[in-house]
Amino acid sequence: PAATISYTGSPYCSNAGTATVTHTGTAGGTYSAAPAGLTINAANGDVTLGTSTPGTYTVTYTIAAAGGCAIFTTTTSITITALPVATINYAGSPYCSNAGTATVTQTGTTGGTYTAAPAGLTINAATGAVTLATSAAGTYTVSYTIAAAGGCPAVIATATISISAANAATISYAGSPYCSTVTSAPVTRTGTAGGTYSASPAGLTINAATGTVNPST
């Protein structure tokens, strides 16, 4: 007897279903594998990838001794790669632009690369760390990509991150000093709106919402 066997698709991804053997020569032999961990059909050599432990195995095809002929064996190898899985998260989002660095929480397969869209986010491609001060305020989608390898396709995990511009403002009363007969002294404000106005020491009549001062009272 004589035979050859091979798994021409090796390496296989663990999610690829079934790996079938290419066999030539004498039929009727049995298949076995070492080390333990490979789910293989002893009669036809089919390998169930999803229930096999990722790794490299030696598969042996054995034809029993018969008709005066000695036992015959031939071998081949098969490699199974675990399907990469990963999640990413920016737990502190939204961040203020003056908060330094935003770090990512990543689980699963390491070694991927980080990208972001749209443009404007300063992100470290290797670590996923975001430099907030040099990033434009807005909301971004960050993608963590594990490249295709070992028969497995590329895997992409995504997360969102939002950055708010730090509050900043200046105020001035351009007409100061005012005469006590003036009834309305408006404030000149630049920067972030929506704040409230107050004064010290006590004695100034000021509108907390607009900042307008009434010197006459």
Language-model regions, residue ranges each:
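Short, exposed coil/turn segments at beta-strand boundaries within extracellular/luminal domains
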Residues: 13, 66-73, 96, 149-156, ...
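Low-complexity "stalk/linker" and mucin-like segments enriched in Ser/Thr/Pro/Ala/Gly
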Residues: 14, 30-44, 48, 111-131, ...
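Interdomain boundary/hinge segments at the C-termini of tandem beta-sandwich modules
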Residues: 76-82, 159-165
